[in-house]
């Protein structure tokens, strides 16, 4: 589980201005290092099984999944991995705002095209970050579930796996969107983002149950919006699957402090 400092009005800011790219604005910050630690933990998953397609989702809206997915994608690109970040939250897309690009064409353009031979490169954009490409959501459709569960979507991901080292997908909250359940089952893994004092425990538990029901590999979970020892406190940890966590806390004077022990 990765822990991030509490921010005010995170969701409204994200919807209006896009996710905050702290890994670009302040790459030497503690929080940027936390995002790099998440990247490292994902890399560890490659030991037993190749992990090239991952999704970030949450139980409910406003957990911060778009911020986490964007910043982790940047750290992957900074590490030299050719990465593409896809905004597949077709209900509340934010990627175009994050990178300040047009959303007139995007994922939905590809999925609704009558020509199955439409070149994905015609709607994939450069992010301005070396090694990172982005595919915005495109116009919001009336049928997101049908589009994302289509064979066209599965084929698109398979094609992108051949072109990129990492395919990162920002998905709608799993309890709000049936398409998230369907799509995660075809990916190498899913990371669940949880926002402290916002995400209800019962909702998080149900989200995990749904992922397990669809046999979606759960790579871990990220805890967001956490107060750690006051206003200057930060924390980091990473949970493997559901029910195990460890971490370190960071502050102005104290560099490391245990926050979590093993959960049984």
List each language-model region with its residue ranges:
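P-loop NTP-binding module
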Residues: 1-264
């Amino acid at each position: 589980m990765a822990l991030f400092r509490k921010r005010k009005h995170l969701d409204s800011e994200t919807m209006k201005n896009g996710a905050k790219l702290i890994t670009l604005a302040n790459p030497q910050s503690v929080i940027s290092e936390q995002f790099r630690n998440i990247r490292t933990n994902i890399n560890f998953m490659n030991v037993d099984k190749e992990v090239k397609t991952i999704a970030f989702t949450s139980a409910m809206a406003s957990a911060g999944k778009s911020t986490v997915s964007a910043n982790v994608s940047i750290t992957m690109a900074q590490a030299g991995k050719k990465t593409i970040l896809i905004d597949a939250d077709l209900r509340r897309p934010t990627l175009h705002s994050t990178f300040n690009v047009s959303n007139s064409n995007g994922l939905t353009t590809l999925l609704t095209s009558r020509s199955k031979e439409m070149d994905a490169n015609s709607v994939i954009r450069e992010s301005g970050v070396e090694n990172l490409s982005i595919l915005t959501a495109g116009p919001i459709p009336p049928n997101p579930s049908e589009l994302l569960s289509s064979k066209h979507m599965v084929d698109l991901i398979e094609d992108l796996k051949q072109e990129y080292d990492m395919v990162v997908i920002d998905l709608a909250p799993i309890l709000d969107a049936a398409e998230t359940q369907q799509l995660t089952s075809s990916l190498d893994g899913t990371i669940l983002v949880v926002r402290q004092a916002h995400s209800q425990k019962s909702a998080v538990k149900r989200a995990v149950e749904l992922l397990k029901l669809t046999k979606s590999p759960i790579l871990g979970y990220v805890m967001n919006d956490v107060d750690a020892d006051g206003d200057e406190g930060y924390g980091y940890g990473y949970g493997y699957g559901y029910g195990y966590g460890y971490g370190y806390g960071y502050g102005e004077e104290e560099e490391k402090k245990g926050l979590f022990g093993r959960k049984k």
